[in-house]
A protein has these predicted regions:
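N-terminal cationic and glycine-rich segments that engage phosphates or anionic surfaces
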Residues: 1-104, 109-439
Length: 439
């Protein structure tokens, strides 16, 4: 990996792209530290310091994707979460709305239209999420238990509220624009790179918090245990993310005029983890809802106490069981909507392709479904284990869920984005090495 980056820096145009990407990253991290107008920075810091010493996992998912900017209430407080949510919603709607499905099949022009819809939905979600965050901050519920939580927004006039919401919405639009700039003029997928940076930015403080709150050898045993578990998980994730089942495909030879077409062989790569990190995000978001209901209802009823005791603590067996089962369910659900065996079989039949030993058409679709279901089982179990291992490791030392709110989500995203970016750099390096033969 380091060799690839070193070679990229020696190539003038790639060096320019890498430096441009680094410049955008610096701007993004700068925006994550500029407070929103109307917020008392001193009171926010007091509450953040107190929250970092305890278990404040309720807003952990959004805070992780914003690189810690959410709880700091900065102009980039919402981070890329509205964009991720909008992308997932449109991906799901593509399956149920024929118009969106037709746009998806139109190629580049259709994809441009879907991207436009994603932008509009991102802004709408940013307004909703920004309004919710400001309302939560004004009421003091953002930092429950903090003595100055209700003084985070000293001036609670309607004008101040509107300014805060507009600023956060504009910040989300700016983040989206920065991501698109990286995609167009930098290295890698822009939004993925910003997601990578947001998660990586929270690692140093999270690891140090584990050390300071640890009890064995001044916290050093917990500290190095978490690092060791992290390295093992990264190795496992890299191995599984690269694993795939290759379905061989042959194309019949056709004569058109005097030219011969086809006769080639290729394969369909079916990844073991075909669903990616989406099931973990879905499961985390769903378990996030009961905690929100309890926090905002302030109810002392039996059901609220049961939820508070069993479904908001990551170390509780009920929570871990529900989390694991939801991940397995969403893995199968997302694979079912993102990979259509019948469509793949029809496209193969249209261009004269077939799987050796399998008839074209419906038998091919059934075979692909059979193989996909078989490899999705180990993929879903792997996702569930990766999501729970950090929680169980920290629980063994009495500090679970305080720094890695949703298990292996961060590691899955970091490894996935890292592998994809390295592949793109290597691809561009190979392309430039072959330029001499193409002249």
């Amino acid at each position: 990996v380091l060799t690839g980056f070193a070679r990229a820096f020696k190539t003038p145009d790639l060096r320019k792209k890498l430096l441009f990407t680094l410049g955008i990253i610096v701007l993004y991290r700068l925006g994550a530290h500029i407070p929103v107008p109307g917020v008392s920075y001193e009171n926010v810091q007091t509450c953040v310091d107190q929250a970092s010493k305890g278990n404040n996992s309720l807003f952990g998912l959004v805070n992780m994707f914003s690189g810690g900017a959410l709880l700091q209430i900065t102009i980039f407080a919402l981070g890329i979460m509205p964009y991720i949510t909008a992308s997932i919603i449109l991906q799901l709607l593509t399956v149920v709305i024929p118009r969106l499905e037709a746009l998806k099949k139109e190629g580049q022009s259709g994809q441009a239209k879907i991207t436009q819809y994603t932008r509009y939905l991102t802004v709408a979600l940013a307004i909703l999420q920004g309004t919710g965050l400001v309302a939560t901050a004004r009421s003091g519920a953002l930092f429950s238990g903090c003595p100055v939580a209700d003084q985070i927004v000293p001036n609670q006039s309607m004008f101040t509220t509107i300014v805060m919401v507009v600023t956060m919405t504009a910040g989300t639009a700016a983040v989206m624009w920065l991501g698109e700039l990286i995609t167009d003029r930098g290295i890698g997928n822009g939004m993925s790179i910003l997601m990578f940076i947001s998660i990586a930015a929270s690692f140093p403080s999270a690891l140090w918090a584990i050390k300071t709150s640890g009890k064995l050898a001044d916290g050093w045993i917990e500290f190095f245990t978490v690092i060791l578990v992290g390295f093992v998980m990264v190795a496992l994730v890299v191995f599984v993310e690269q694993a795939q089942r290759r379905i061989p495909v042959q194309y019949a030879k056709r004569m058109i005029g005097r030219r011969s077409y086809g006769g080639t062989s290729t394969y369909i790569p079916l990844k073991v983890n075909q669903a990616g990190v989406i099931p973990v995000i879905f499961a985390s978001s769903l378990l996030y809802i009961p905690a929100l209901i309890v926090q905002f209802s302030n109810s002392k009823a039996g059901w609220a106490i049961w939820i508070q005791d069993n479904l908001t603590k990551g170390t509780h067996p009920y929570y871990m069981t529900a989390y694991f089962l939801l991940i397995v369910f969403f893995a199968f659900f997302y694979v079912a909507i993102s990979f259509n065996p019948e469509e793949v079989a029809d496209n193969m039949k249209k261009y004269g392709g077939f799987i050796p030993g399998i008839r074209a058409g419906r038998p091919t679709a059934e075979y692909l479904s059979y193989v996909l279901n078989r490899i999705t089982w180990p993929g879903s179990l792997y996702l569930g284990l990766i999501a729970l291992v950090p929680t169980m490791a920290l629980a063994g030392f009495g500090g679970a869920n305080q720094n890695f709110p949703f298990g292996g989500t961060s590691i899955l995203i970091i490894v996935g984005v890292g592998l994809e970016t390295v592949k793109q750099i290597e691809s561009q390096l190979q392309q430039r090495n072959y330029e001499g033969f193409l002249r």
